[in-house]
């Protein structure tokens, strides 16, 4: 993203030049969902974008994926005038999730760990131990990154961090109950199948496919999820390594 000094050095002229370059060279993906004839839609889109600067379209750049942490766990901290702390943990997953098989396994792991209201982070860290106002995990498939977000009382930072990591360790050791497994399967497959009911979710789904260079539909991914075994999810969990920890504390905390 650059630095504050680099941002301050940008001139209006340079910014406009870069803007025109982007219009001329950036790849453009147009997505349509509806009942109109595709040929008619294409004609309308071409007319609407005919005024764009015309240049050689650059391919989407490959995303840099760091498979494992480069060194010891990094810690970052900010202090603001806030009444609730934030604790965010960043993990490397051992690689990106681009194939149908790897995405299915990653989705199931995330659902078990912290991606649903039946997950370990929600039921144990938030509900049972009351260490967080909220605690959930998110998987960046194309970057190979897992992030855990939580809202924490200032006095509970250490305990919350330890318990978040303990729940990951439980997944890595295969300590996943049948109830957790079935709940995760229902959640992931249900979410994929209902993607077909919402235009916005379909657009988001296919944008991810374009970026990753794949083209399998939500129904196929749901079928793949149904074939995943618990052992395969545990293998996915075992590749995950802690990389960074960020805390937002109060100015007096």
Regions found by a protein language model. Give the residues of each.
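Basic, gly/Ser/Thr/Pro-rich low-complexity segments located predominantly at protein N termini
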Residues: 39, 95, 119-120, 218
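Charge-rich, well-structured scaffold segments of protease-associated domains
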Residues: 1-59, 105, 127-253
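His/Glu-based metal-binding/catalytic segments typifying zinc-dependent metallopeptidases
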Residues: 57-118
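Intrinsically disordered, low-complexity segments enriched in polar/charged residues with Gly/Pro
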Residues: 17, 62-65, 111-112, 124, ...
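M16/MPP (pitrilysin/insulinase) zinc-metallopeptidase core fold and M16-derived inactive scaffolds
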Residues: 112-130, 142
């Amino acid at each position: 993203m650059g630095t504050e000094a680099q941002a301050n050095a940008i001139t209006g002229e340079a910014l406009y030049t870069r803007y025109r370059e982007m219009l001329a060279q950036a790849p453009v993906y147009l997505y349509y969902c509806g009942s109109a004839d595709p040929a008619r839609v294409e004609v309308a889109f071409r007319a609407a974008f005919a005024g764009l600067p015309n240049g050689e379209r650059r391919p989407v750049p490959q995303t840099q994926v760091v498979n494992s942490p480069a060194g010891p766990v990094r810690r970052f901290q900010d202090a603001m005038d806030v009444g609730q702390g934030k604790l965010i943990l960043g993990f490397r997953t051992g690689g990106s999730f681009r194939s149908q098989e790897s995405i299915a396994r990653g989705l199931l792991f995330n659902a078990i760990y912290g991606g649903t209201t039946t997950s370990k982070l929600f039921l144990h860290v938030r509900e049972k131990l009351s260490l967080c106002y909220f605690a959930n995990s998110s998987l960046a498939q194309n970057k190979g990154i897992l992030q855990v977000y939580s809202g924490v009382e200032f006095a509970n930072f250490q305990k919350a961090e330890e318990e978040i990591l303990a729940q990951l360790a439980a997944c890595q050791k295969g300590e996943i109950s049948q109830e957790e497994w079935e709940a995760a399967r229902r959640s992931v497959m249900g979410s994929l199948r209902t993607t077909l009911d919402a235009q916005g979710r379909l657009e988001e789904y296919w944008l991810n496919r374009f970026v990753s260079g794949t083209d399998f539909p939500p129904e196929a991914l749901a079928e793949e999820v149904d074939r995943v075994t618990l052992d395969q999810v545990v293998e996915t969990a075992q590749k995950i390594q802690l990389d960074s920890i960020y805390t937002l504390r109060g100015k007096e905390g």
